Amino acid sequence: MSTVTITDLARENVRNLTPYQSARRLGGNGDVWLNANEYPTAVEFQLTQQTLNRYPECQPKAVIENYAQYAGVKPEQVLVSRGADEGIELLIRAFCEPGKDAILYCPPTYGMYSVSAETIGVECRTVPTLDNWQLDLQGISDKLDGVKVVYVCSPNNPTGQLINPQDFRTLLELTRGKAIVVADEAYIEFCPQASLTGWLAEYPHLAILRTLSKAFALAGLRCGFTLANEEVINLLMKVIAPYPLSTPVADIAAQALSPQGIVAMRERVTQIIAEREYLIAALKEIPCVEQVFDSETNYILARFKASSTVFKSLWDQGIILRDQNKQPSLSGCLRITVGTREESQRVIDALRAEQV
Protein backbone atom coordinates (compact mmCIF):
# COMPACT_ATOMS: atom_id res chain seq x y z
CA MET A 1 0.00 0.00 0.00
CA SER A 2 1.48 3.33 -1.04
CA THR A 3 1.89 5.96 1.64
CA VAL A 4 0.28 9.32 0.90
CA THR A 5 2.30 12.23 2.25
CA ILE A 6 0.86 15.50 3.50
CA THR A 7 2.29 17.18 0.39
CA ASP A 8 0.43 14.66 -1.79
CA LEU A 9 -2.81 15.80 -0.16
CA ALA A 10 -2.22 19.41 -1.22
CA ARG A 11 -3.77 20.87 -4.37
CA GLU A 12 -1.60 20.23 -7.41
CA ASN A 13 -1.23 23.92 -8.26
CA VAL A 14 -0.11 24.65 -4.67
CA ARG A 15 2.51 21.88 -4.80
CA ASN A 16 3.96 23.56 -7.89
CA LEU A 17 4.02 27.09 -6.42
CA THR A 18 7.14 29.05 -5.52
CA PRO A 19 6.46 31.47 -2.60
CA TYR A 20 6.70 35.16 -3.48
CA GLN A 21 10.13 36.45 -2.52
CA SER A 22 9.21 39.59 -0.61
CA ALA A 23 12.00 41.93 0.46
CA ARG A 24 11.57 40.82 4.06
CA ARG A 25 11.62 37.14 3.14
CA LEU A 26 14.91 37.55 1.26
CA GLY A 27 16.39 38.74 4.54
CA GLY A 28 19.91 40.04 4.94
CA ASN A 29 21.63 41.55 7.95
CA GLY A 30 21.73 45.10 6.74
CA ASP A 31 21.39 48.40 8.50
CA VAL A 32 20.54 50.29 5.29
CA TRP A 33 17.30 48.75 4.02
CA LEU A 34 16.63 50.05 0.51
CA ASN A 35 14.91 47.01 -0.96
CA ALA A 36 11.20 47.31 -0.11
CA ASN A 37 10.26 50.90 -1.08
CA GLU A 38 9.36 51.74 2.51
CA TYR A 39 9.55 55.20 4.06
CA PRO A 40 12.92 55.33 5.86
CA THR A 41 11.82 56.54 9.30
CA ALA A 42 8.92 55.60 11.58
CA VAL A 43 5.94 57.90 12.08
CA GLU A 44 4.47 57.94 15.60
CA PHE A 45 0.79 57.34 16.36
CA GLN A 46 -1.17 56.95 19.60
CA LEU A 47 -4.00 54.43 19.79
CA THR A 48 -7.32 56.09 20.64
CA GLN A 49 -9.65 53.05 20.47
CA GLN A 50 -9.68 50.95 23.65
CA THR A 51 -12.28 48.42 22.48
CA LEU A 52 -10.12 45.39 21.76
CA ASN A 53 -12.68 43.12 23.45
CA ARG A 54 -15.04 43.76 20.50
CA TYR A 55 -14.74 42.65 16.88
CA PRO A 56 -13.99 45.53 14.50
CA GLU A 57 -16.25 46.78 11.71
CA CYS A 58 -15.64 45.04 8.38
CA GLN A 59 -15.30 48.42 6.65
CA PRO A 60 -14.50 50.99 9.36
CA LYS A 61 -16.60 54.10 8.72
CA ALA A 62 -13.94 56.68 9.63
CA VAL A 63 -11.33 55.01 7.41
CA ILE A 64 -13.68 54.71 4.42
CA GLU A 65 -14.98 58.29 4.73
CA ASN A 66 -11.53 59.80 5.23
CA TYR A 67 -10.10 57.89 2.26
CA ALA A 68 -13.04 58.77 0.01
CA GLN A 69 -12.57 62.45 0.82
CA TYR A 70 -8.81 62.23 0.21
CA ALA A 71 -9.19 60.34 -3.10
CA GLY A 72 -12.09 62.45 -4.37
CA VAL A 73 -14.55 59.55 -4.67
CA LYS A 74 -17.76 58.50 -2.92
CA PRO A 75 -17.56 56.26 0.18
CA GLU A 76 -19.54 53.61 -1.75
CA GLN A 77 -16.60 53.44 -4.20
CA VAL A 78 -14.04 52.49 -1.52
CA LEU A 79 -13.09 49.10 -0.09
CA VAL A 80 -10.38 48.81 2.58
CA SER A 81 -8.30 45.63 2.87
CA ARG A 82 -5.12 44.12 4.36
CA GLY A 83 -2.82 46.03 2.05
CA ALA A 84 -3.39 46.42 -1.69
CA ASP A 85 -2.17 42.80 -1.96
CA GLU A 86 -5.48 41.59 -0.56
CA GLY A 87 -7.24 43.80 -3.12
CA ILE A 88 -5.30 42.05 -5.92
CA GLU A 89 -6.52 38.68 -4.65
CA LEU A 90 -10.13 39.76 -4.02
CA LEU A 91 -10.50 40.90 -7.63
CA ILE A 92 -9.36 37.49 -8.89
CA ARG A 93 -11.61 35.64 -6.45
CA ALA A 94 -14.62 37.75 -7.42
CA PHE A 95 -14.18 37.70 -11.20
CA CYS A 96 -12.13 34.64 -12.23
CA GLU A 97 -13.35 31.06 -12.46
CA PRO A 98 -10.43 28.74 -11.53
CA GLY A 99 -9.42 26.46 -14.41
CA LYS A 100 -11.36 28.58 -16.90
CA ASP A 101 -10.59 32.32 -16.77
CA ALA A 102 -7.25 34.13 -16.95
CA ILE A 103 -5.60 37.29 -15.68
CA LEU A 104 -3.17 39.33 -17.80
CA TYR A 105 -0.25 41.53 -16.74
CA CYS A 106 2.71 43.16 -18.44
CA PRO A 107 6.19 42.32 -17.13
CA PRO A 108 8.53 43.63 -15.90
CA THR A 109 6.12 44.50 -13.08
CA TYR A 110 4.98 43.68 -9.54
CA GLY A 111 5.12 39.97 -8.71
CA MET A 112 1.96 39.52 -6.64
CA TYR A 113 -0.47 39.49 -9.58
CA SER A 114 0.82 36.11 -10.72
CA VAL A 115 1.22 34.73 -7.18
CA SER A 116 -2.41 35.52 -6.31
CA ALA A 117 -3.73 34.00 -9.53
CA GLU A 118 -1.60 30.86 -9.29
CA THR A 119 -2.65 30.29 -5.67
CA ILE A 120 -6.31 30.35 -6.71
CA GLY A 121 -5.73 28.20 -9.81
CA VAL A 122 -6.32 30.94 -12.38
CA GLU A 123 -4.25 31.09 -15.57
CA CYS A 124 -1.69 33.91 -15.93
CA ARG A 125 -1.03 35.47 -19.31
CA THR A 126 1.80 37.89 -19.87
CA VAL A 127 2.35 40.50 -22.55
CA PRO A 128 5.81 42.01 -21.98
CA THR A 129 5.98 45.78 -22.27
CA LEU A 130 7.63 47.50 -25.23
CA ASP A 131 11.27 48.63 -25.09
CA ASN A 132 10.18 51.91 -23.40
CA TRP A 133 8.16 49.90 -20.80
CA GLN A 134 4.86 51.12 -22.21
CA LEU A 135 1.97 48.76 -22.98
CA ASP A 136 2.03 46.53 -26.06
CA LEU A 137 -1.62 47.18 -26.90
CA GLN A 138 -1.64 44.91 -29.97
CA GLY A 139 -0.13 42.09 -27.92
CA ILE A 140 -2.73 42.60 -25.19
CA SER A 141 -5.57 42.67 -27.74
CA ASP A 142 -4.36 39.36 -29.22
CA LYS A 143 -4.42 37.64 -25.79
CA LEU A 144 -7.63 39.06 -24.28
CA ASP A 145 -9.90 36.14 -25.11
CA GLY A 146 -10.83 34.49 -21.80
CA VAL A 147 -9.11 37.19 -19.69
CA LYS A 148 -11.27 38.57 -16.88
CA VAL A 149 -8.80 40.86 -15.04
CA VAL A 150 -5.94 42.97 -16.48
CA TYR A 151 -3.38 44.42 -14.03
CA VAL A 152 -1.40 47.54 -14.95
CA CYS A 153 0.93 49.12 -12.40
CA SER A 154 1.35 52.90 -12.88
CA PRO A 155 3.81 54.20 -11.87
CA ASN A 156 5.22 50.77 -12.59
CA ASN A 157 7.19 48.80 -10.02
CA PRO A 158 10.15 48.26 -10.53
CA THR A 159 10.75 50.53 -13.55
CA GLY A 160 9.38 53.73 -12.00
CA GLN A 161 7.63 55.28 -15.01
CA LEU A 162 3.99 56.17 -15.63
CA ILE A 163 1.92 54.34 -18.21
CA ASN A 164 0.81 56.60 -21.06
CA PRO A 165 -2.77 57.73 -20.24
CA GLN A 166 -3.88 57.38 -23.86
CA ASP A 167 -2.76 53.73 -23.76
CA PHE A 168 -4.84 53.27 -20.60
CA ARG A 169 -7.86 54.66 -22.45
CA THR A 170 -7.29 52.32 -25.39
CA LEU A 171 -6.99 49.37 -22.98
CA LEU A 172 -10.21 50.37 -21.22
CA GLU A 173 -12.01 50.51 -24.58
CA LEU A 174 -10.56 47.12 -25.63
CA THR A 175 -11.80 45.49 -22.41
CA ARG A 176 -15.21 47.17 -22.09
CA GLY A 177 -17.82 44.49 -21.38
CA LYS A 178 -15.10 41.80 -21.25
CA ALA A 179 -12.73 42.33 -18.33
CA ILE A 180 -11.90 44.42 -15.27
CA VAL A 181 -8.88 46.72 -15.72
CA VAL A 182 -6.97 47.23 -12.48
CA ALA A 183 -4.71 50.29 -12.23
CA ASP A 184 -2.26 49.64 -9.40
CA GLU A 185 -1.55 53.12 -8.00
CA ALA A 186 0.53 52.10 -4.98
CA TYR A 187 3.00 54.92 -5.74
CA ILE A 188 0.57 57.55 -7.02
CA GLU A 189 1.20 59.94 -4.11
CA PHE A 190 4.56 60.74 -5.76
CA CYS A 191 2.77 61.86 -8.97
CA PRO A 192 -0.88 62.52 -7.95
CA GLN A 193 -1.73 64.33 -11.19
CA ALA A 194 -1.57 60.96 -12.99
CA SER A 195 -4.30 59.21 -10.96
CA LEU A 196 -7.19 57.62 -12.86
CA THR A 197 -9.77 58.21 -10.08
CA GLY A 198 -11.49 60.82 -12.28
CA TRP A 199 -12.18 58.11 -14.88
CA LEU A 200 -14.38 55.88 -12.69
CA ALA A 201 -17.63 57.47 -13.92
CA GLU A 202 -16.61 56.84 -17.53
CA TYR A 203 -15.40 53.25 -17.12
CA PRO A 204 -17.55 50.91 -14.98
CA HIS A 205 -14.92 48.16 -15.36
CA LEU A 206 -12.03 50.21 -13.91
CA ALA A 207 -10.66 49.40 -10.44
CA ILE A 208 -7.81 51.26 -8.74
CA LEU A 209 -5.52 49.87 -6.04
CA ARG A 210 -4.04 52.15 -3.37
CA THR A 211 -1.97 51.67 -0.21
CA LEU A 212 -0.78 53.35 2.99
CA SER A 213 2.56 51.49 2.74
CA LYS A 214 4.54 54.01 0.69
CA ALA A 215 3.99 57.76 1.00
CA PHE A 216 1.91 57.31 4.17
CA ALA A 217 4.91 55.51 5.77
CA LEU A 218 2.77 52.67 7.13
CA ALA A 219 4.07 49.49 5.44
CA GLY A 220 3.86 47.65 8.77
CA LEU A 221 0.16 48.50 9.13
CA ARG A 222 -0.95 46.44 6.09
CA CYS A 223 -3.74 48.72 4.92
CA GLY A 224 -4.77 49.20 1.31
CA PHE A 225 -7.77 50.30 -0.73
CA THR A 226 -9.67 49.36 -3.86
CA LEU A 227 -11.49 52.23 -5.58
CA ALA A 228 -14.17 51.20 -8.07
CA ASN A 229 -17.79 51.67 -8.99
CA GLU A 230 -20.35 50.47 -6.47
CA GLU A 231 -21.23 47.34 -8.49
CA VAL A 232 -17.59 46.16 -8.34
CA ILE A 233 -17.26 47.02 -4.63
CA ASN A 234 -20.44 45.06 -3.80
CA LEU A 235 -19.01 41.96 -5.50
CA LEU A 236 -15.71 42.31 -3.62
CA MET A 237 -17.66 42.58 -0.35
CA LYS A 238 -18.98 39.05 -1.03
CA VAL A 239 -15.48 37.54 -0.96
CA ILE A 240 -13.64 39.68 1.62
CA ALA A 241 -13.00 38.28 5.12
CA PRO A 242 -15.47 39.47 7.79
CA TYR A 243 -12.82 41.42 9.75
CA PRO A 244 -10.03 42.43 7.35
CA LEU A 245 -8.75 45.29 9.54
CA SER A 246 -7.95 44.99 13.23
CA THR A 247 -9.10 47.81 15.51
CA PRO A 248 -5.57 49.28 15.97
CA VAL A 249 -5.02 49.26 12.18
CA ALA A 250 -8.31 51.07 11.56
CA ASP A 251 -7.52 53.55 14.34
CA ILE A 252 -4.09 54.46 12.92
CA ALA A 253 -5.35 54.50 9.31
CA ALA A 254 -8.09 56.99 10.21
CA GLN A 255 -5.49 59.24 11.88
CA ALA A 256 -3.14 58.98 8.87
CA LEU A 257 -6.01 60.07 6.61
CA SER A 258 -7.05 63.04 8.76
CA PRO A 259 -6.37 66.54 7.33
CA GLN A 260 -3.17 66.75 9.44
CA GLY A 261 -2.16 63.27 8.31
CA ILE A 262 -2.55 64.21 4.64
CA VAL A 263 -0.44 67.36 5.14
CA ALA A 264 2.30 65.30 6.81
CA MET A 265 2.19 62.76 3.95
CA ARG A 266 2.60 65.52 1.34
CA GLU A 267 5.58 66.90 3.24
CA ARG A 268 7.18 63.44 3.20
CA VAL A 269 6.58 63.19 -0.55
CA THR A 270 8.29 66.54 -1.15
CA GLN A 271 11.27 65.44 0.93
CA ILE A 272 11.55 62.03 -0.81
CA ILE A 273 11.35 63.60 -4.29
CA ALA A 274 14.16 66.03 -3.40
CA GLU A 275 16.25 63.13 -2.09
CA ARG A 276 15.47 61.09 -5.21
CA GLU A 277 16.80 63.84 -7.47
CA TYR A 278 19.96 64.11 -5.35
CA LEU A 279 20.54 60.35 -5.58
CA ILE A 280 19.84 60.20 -9.34
CA ALA A 281 22.34 62.99 -10.00
CA ALA A 282 25.00 61.24 -7.90
CA LEU A 283 24.40 57.81 -9.48
CA LYS A 284 24.89 59.24 -12.98
CA GLU A 285 28.47 60.19 -12.04
CA ILE A 286 29.51 56.76 -10.71
CA PRO A 287 31.68 54.58 -13.02
CA CYS A 288 29.97 51.23 -12.30
CA VAL A 289 26.53 52.70 -13.11
CA GLU A 290 25.70 52.26 -16.80
CA GLN A 291 22.24 53.84 -16.83
CA VAL A 292 19.85 55.53 -14.40
CA PHE A 293 16.18 55.47 -15.37
CA ASP A 294 13.77 58.33 -14.71
CA SER A 295 11.44 57.74 -11.78
CA GLU A 296 8.06 59.08 -10.67
CA THR A 297 8.26 57.13 -7.39
CA ASN A 298 10.25 56.65 -4.16
CA TYR A 299 12.75 54.29 -5.81
CA ILE A 300 15.27 54.35 -8.64
CA LEU A 301 16.06 51.63 -11.16
CA ALA A 302 19.62 51.60 -12.47
CA ARG A 303 21.70 49.30 -14.67
CA PHE A 304 25.15 48.35 -13.39
CA LYS A 305 28.32 46.79 -14.73
CA ALA A 306 28.65 43.38 -13.01
CA SER A 307 25.42 44.00 -11.13
CA SER A 308 25.55 40.69 -9.22
CA THR A 309 29.00 41.56 -7.88
CA VAL A 310 27.86 45.07 -6.95
CA PHE A 311 24.70 43.74 -5.28
CA LYS A 312 26.66 41.24 -3.17
CA SER A 313 29.37 43.75 -2.29
CA LEU A 314 26.80 46.24 -0.96
CA TRP A 315 24.89 43.40 0.77
CA ASP A 316 28.10 42.43 2.58
CA GLN A 317 28.44 46.07 3.71
CA GLY A 318 24.91 46.02 5.16
CA ILE A 319 23.32 47.93 2.25
CA ILE A 320 20.37 45.88 0.99
CA LEU A 321 19.09 46.69 -2.52
CA ARG A 322 16.58 44.76 -4.69
CA ASP A 323 18.02 42.67 -7.51
CA GLN A 324 15.85 42.86 -10.66
CA ASN A 325 18.08 40.74 -12.94
CA LYS A 326 15.53 37.97 -13.37
CA GLN A 327 12.77 40.27 -14.63
CA PRO A 328 12.27 40.49 -18.42
CA SER A 329 14.41 43.27 -20.00
CA LEU A 330 16.03 44.15 -16.65
CA SER A 331 19.36 42.32 -16.87
CA GLY A 332 21.99 44.17 -14.86
CA CYS A 333 19.35 46.22 -13.02
CA LEU A 334 19.10 46.92 -9.30
CA ARG A 335 16.29 48.88 -7.63
CA ILE A 336 17.21 51.36 -4.91
CA THR A 337 14.62 52.75 -2.49
CA VAL A 338 15.06 56.45 -1.74
CA GLY A 339 15.95 56.67 1.94
CA THR A 340 17.46 59.34 4.18
CA ARG A 341 20.39 61.54 3.12
CA GLU A 342 22.70 59.42 5.29
CA GLU A 343 21.49 56.26 3.55
CA SER A 344 21.91 57.86 0.11
CA GLN A 345 25.46 58.78 1.05
CA ARG A 346 26.23 55.24 2.19
CA VAL A 347 25.05 53.93 -1.19
CA ILE A 348 26.96 56.57 -3.16
CA ASP A 349 30.21 56.00 -1.24
CA ALA A 350 29.94 52.21 -1.54
CA LEU A 351 29.26 52.36 -5.28
CA ARG A 352 32.12 54.82 -5.88
CA ALA A 353 34.47 52.34 -4.22
CA GLU A 354 33.43 49.46 -6.53
CA GLN A 355 36.21 48.28 -8.85
CA VAL A 356 34.24 46.40 -11.53
Swiss-Prot record:
Reaction(s) catalysed (UniProt annotation): L-histidinol phosphate + 2-oxoglutarate = 3-(imidazol-4-yl)-2-oxopropyl phosphate + L-glutamate
CDD domains according to UniProt: AAT_like (cd00609)
Cofactor(s) needed for function: pyridoxal 5'-phosphate
GO molecular function: histidinol-phosphate transaminase activity; pyridoxal phosphate binding
Pathway: Amino-acid biosynthesis; L-histidine biosynthesis; L-histidine from 5-phospho-alpha-D-ribose 1-diphosphate: step 7/9
N6-(pyridoxal phosphate)lysine sites (modified residues): K214
InterPro entries reported for this sequence: Aminotrans_II_pyridoxalP_BS (IPR001917), Aminotransferase_I/II_large (IPR004839), HisP_aminotrans (IPR005861), PyrdxlP-dep_Trfase (IPR015424), PyrdxlP-dep_Trfase_major (IPR015421), PyrdxlP-dep_Trfase_small (IPR015422)
SUPFAM superfamilies assigned to the protein according to its UniProt record, in alphabetical order: PLP-dependent transferases (SSF53383)
Keywords: Amino-acid biosynthesis, Aminotransferase, Histidine biosynthesis, Pyridoxal phosphate, Transferase
One Pfam family per UniProt: Aminotran_1_2
GO biological process, one term: L-histidine biosynthetic process
Transmembrane segments: none
NCBIfam families attached to this UniProt entry: hisC
Subunit structure: Homodimer.
Listed name of the protein: Histidinol-phosphate aminotransferase
Gene source species: Escherichia coli O139:H28 (strain E24377A / ETEC)
